[in-house]
Amino acid sequence: MSTQMSVFLSTQAAQPQWGEKALISFAEQGATIHLQQTQDFSAIQRAARKLDNQGIRTAFLAGEGWDLESIWAFYQGYRDAKKRNTVEWKALAAAEQVELEARIKATDWTRDIINKSAEEVAPRQLATMAAEFIKSLAPDHVSYRIVKDKDLLTEGWEGIYAVGRGSERTSAMLQLDYNPTGDENAPVFACLVGKGITFDSGGYSLKPSNMMSAMKADMGGSGMITGALGLAIMRGFNKRVKLILCCAENMVSGRALKLGDIITYKNGKTVEIMNTDAEGRLVLADGLIYASEQKPQLIIDCATLTGAAKNALGNDYHALLSYDESLSQQALAAAKEENEALWALPLAEFHREMLPSNFADLSNISNGDYTPGASTAAAFLSYFVEGYQKGWLHFDCSATYRKSASDKWAAGATGMGVKMLARILMQQA
């Protein structure tokens, strides 16, 4: 079969020889995607996956019906980690073309950096690459610093340093300031905090190989939240925002974090380490303390934080946890408007009491049988957010990465959540 093909949309059923309710049929002029209803974006994305699997390397979206959202759905399904495919389409209206190109630029960056190997993206490289991406979009409005290695201790960022001290690759914290106001004293509207664990072996609480194989993607929260800020900037976002990425590699060595160690955080909280594989919350705590120091109206953190969230929701939804019910409802509405899957998991005050330690203020994991891991992880983070009951959203990113392909997604990073977070920023401003 040719590696180039025109692709058409139709709401008419395929001819019988293609099978009952066939999604795709082929003819001399190209392939036709048969939709059960107009604007069936899921079907378009599934059809794009089928075309990729059949070796079609260039698709021209021809005929009627290809608007912004249908082109986007096709692009999402057609793209794979090897970036072998090219999509071409007829010109859209100017505003729609700008929006489509912005989506592609932001999500491609997110998917690419998550798909890179841990050898390519060490903690300092992640911080640098994220900063350079955002600065490329608004060079006159972005400044940043990267705090690394022993400087983390000097400035009080004990969690990031402790998690990464077992690796030969130094840990880093990105502190990026996007300030389009022209006023260096302008208030910070929002702080965006990302977990940036560039590889997670589990530390001494070692992961089995089948659980470790995808852990280059444990920085997916940083990738997602950086991409979202980039998309918001390209959409014209004009409020001051700080991006904080907490970057480390969780490895085993004679210097690595051990069970029973106690971390003393900048806000005075002490944490006993009862599981070194619950490291994401340890680095995020530093980022949330820094975010709280900025006194923003809004704090959003993103992290591939718990297996519990993925067990609950699979790879198809991101999890949302927040004490702010009104803000949560607005976030869920934003996700729906962007056609991205988000589901709220419970977070209550009693979850904060499920992290007892005999030697510190908190344990880094909850105790007991059948504890709600995603909820207690979010509750742990709340101890590092000033005024945690209002203006804070925590995303446990279950849908950033897929170890194997599905009918809608190639294996690897998805870019899901970038549009949703960008919309939340725009709507809250």
Swiss-Prot record:
The keyword Translocase does not apply. Keywords: Aminopeptidase, Cytoplasm, Hydrolase, Manganese, Metal-binding, Protease. GO terms for biological process: proteolysis. The active site is at K207, R281. It comes from the Bacteria. It is an enzyme of class 3 (hydrolase). Mn(2+) 1 binds at D200, D277, E279. InterPro entries: Leucine_aapep/pepB, M17_PepB-like_N, Pept_M17_PepB, Peptidase_M17_C. CDD domains: Peptidase_M17 (cd00433). GO terms for cellular component: cytoplasm. It is found in: Cytoplasm. It catalyses: Release of an N-terminal amino acid, Xaa, from a peptide or arylamide. Xaa is preferably Glu or Asp but may be other amino acids, including Leu, Met, His, Cys and Gln. Its cofactor is Mn(2+). Binds 2 manganese ions per subunit. Homohexamer. Belongs to the peptidase M17 family. This is Peptidase B. It comes from Vibrio cholerae serotype O1 (strain ATCC 39315 / El Tor Inaba N16961). The gene is pepB.
